[in-house]
């Protein structure tokens, strides 16, 4: 079974990468084109209006759907435009129904005990936020069968896409998803019986608040190609058991802002082609992992985009296989403690292009670094202390700093999000065997750029399983690939990472500053928590 899943994972990645460079289609003035390759027209759409008392169809159309009170079931192919406000309603696409376009055109839909939108097994559905429209979907605490086992209607997500469903979320309007039950958006698996499953997000302005579990959770292929996403989650911001693709070659999108989460982006195979990504997490910002660490080739590949990652008590980028950075701009800050590593991989870390600044407490247990593009390393390269212990600092939190070449030219400048005892820097401007000086306040630290295989310590540092899996391989009860409500995986020494505001993170405000605001640059001490 694990071998089959590995093959499916590889096939899904190949298909998604093949589509990565697709060009936008010509604009057709007779249709609305929210994104490349996605067209819809309201001319022949069935218009359905929700109210608290029921659903009405414009012009008396009565084909392709069924109405039961405030529950709408779509039974046939076509375009359905939904609007209105309802305090307890739902939309369901019947199993096996394909060719469905669901246009949200000013819809505010809440459901009391199930998912506001459910795409059943083997469906093909495009959910479009109409141009300029503002839409919202909200569930209740009862939409969680872990907490309410007697609720047979619970779907554990605001938008539930079941096994074998192929769903695209797109449009030039906005959609706010509030998950009071469990997940924001949940996509199912590819199975022999139900067919291939996938979830794609394009162009949409998507806001997800998930105070219980994940914002987006997929069991198969998840493509976030473009759009603007703002996410706050108790657990993962965006998770896929298998393949997660962010962006597309030759494009600028998407823009992803994660204001709070446990882990940021997580998948067995995580690929970032483009985008502007800003993640604030309490554990790993990027994680190549899933709930089962056997039978997969875990990879993290970054070829473009701008990524700013800040972890208060975890690693920056953590791969249970190889980690490759070949382009883009990557800035990572992790808390200045001995067990927080900005870059961590079981396999080889390869830097062959782009601009990389990775700063944190230390290089942990060390890393196997292939510097195809030269890099300069400052500070701790080993254990450096007991897990959780604070390190002396090269830079203090909030300090302005520069990295200069031998002629005094700045090759990088910035402001520290937290104190850091370990800094790795690489860019196209760095020349092997040349000297570079890190300057912060009145202090300076010398370094020499290296290339080829670079050893930073005592060997590779292993990551932990994704999705809440404990190191001993035992999943928690009611396991669905993610952590149960509020739990955190144990570290080998039994220490559990601290999380802000109790068990669930909340959007930070001034996170990471000491009582007096900041430590002075170069004074040898530092805040241990990155600033927001």
Predicted regions and their residues:
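N-terminal hydrophobic targeting signals that begin at the initiator methionine
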Residues: 1-2
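A composition-driven surface/loop motif
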Residues: 5-14, 20-532
């Amino acid at each position: 079974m694990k071998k089959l899943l590995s093959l499916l994972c590889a096939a899904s990645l190949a298909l998604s990468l093949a589509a990565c460079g697709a060009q936008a289609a010509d604009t057709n003035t007779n249709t609305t084109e929210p994104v490349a390759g996605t067209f819809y027209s309201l001319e022949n759409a069935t218009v359905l209006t929700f109210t608290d008392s029921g659903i009405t169809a414009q012009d008396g159309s009565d084909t392709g759907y069924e109405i039961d009170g405030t529950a709408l079931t779509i039974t046939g192919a076509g375009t359905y435009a939904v609007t209105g406000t309802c305090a307890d309603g739902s939309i369901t696409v019947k199993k096996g129904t394909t060719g469905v376009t669901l246009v949200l055109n000013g819809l505010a839909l809440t459901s009391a005990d199930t998912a506001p939108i459910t795409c059943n097994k083997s469906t093909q559905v495009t959910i479009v936020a109409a141009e300029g429209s503002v839409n919202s979907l909200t569930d209740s605490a009862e939409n969680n069968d872990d907490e309410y086992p007697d609720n047979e209607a619970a779907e554990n997500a605001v938008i539930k896409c079941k096994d074998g469903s192929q769903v695209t979320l797109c449009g030039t309007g906005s959609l706010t998803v509030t998950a009071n039950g469990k997940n924001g958006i949940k996509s199912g698996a590819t199975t022999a019986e139900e067919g291939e499953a996938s979830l794609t997000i394009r162009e949409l302005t998507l806001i997800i608040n998930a105070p219980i579990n994940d914002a987006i959770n997929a069991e198969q292929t998840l493509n976030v190609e473009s759009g603007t996403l703002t996410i706050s989650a108790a657990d993962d911001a965006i998770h896929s058991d298998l393949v997660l693709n962010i962006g597309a070659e030759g494009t600028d999108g998407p823009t992803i802002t994660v204001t709070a989460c446990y882990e940021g982006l997580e998948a067995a195979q995580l690929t970032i082609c483009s985008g502007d990504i800003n993640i604030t997490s309490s554990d790993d910002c990027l994680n190549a992992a899933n709930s089962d660490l056997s039978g997969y080739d875990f990879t993290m590949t970054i070829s473009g985009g701008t990524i700013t990652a800040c972890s208060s008590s975890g690693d920056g980028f953590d791969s249970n296989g190889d980690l490759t950075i070949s382009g883009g701009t990557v800035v990572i800050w992790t808390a200045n403690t001995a067990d927080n590593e900005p870059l961590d991989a079981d396999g080889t870390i390869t830097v062959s292009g782009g601009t990389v600044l990775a700063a944190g407490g230390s290089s942990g247990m060390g890393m196997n670094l292939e510097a195809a593009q030269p890099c300069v390393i400052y500070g701790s390269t080993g254990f450096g202390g007991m897990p959780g212990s604070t390190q002396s600092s090269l830079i203090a939190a909030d300090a302005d700093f520069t990295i200069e070449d031998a002629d005094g030219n700045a090759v990088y400048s910035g402001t520290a999000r937290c104190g850091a005892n370990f800094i790795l820097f690489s860019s196209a401007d760095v020349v092997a065997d040349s000297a570079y000086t890190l300057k912060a306040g009145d202090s300076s630290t010398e370094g020499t750029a290296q290339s080829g295989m670079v050893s930073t310590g005592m060997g590779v540092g292993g990551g932990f399983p994704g999705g809440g899996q404990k190191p001993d391989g035992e999943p928690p009860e009611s396991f669905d690939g993610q952590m149960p409500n509020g739990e955190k995986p144990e570290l080998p020494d039994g220490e559990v990472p601290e999380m802000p505001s109790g068990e669930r993170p909340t959007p930070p405000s001034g996170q990471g500053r000491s009582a007096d605001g900041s430590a002075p640059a170069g004074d040898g001490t530092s805040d241990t928590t990155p600033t927001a």
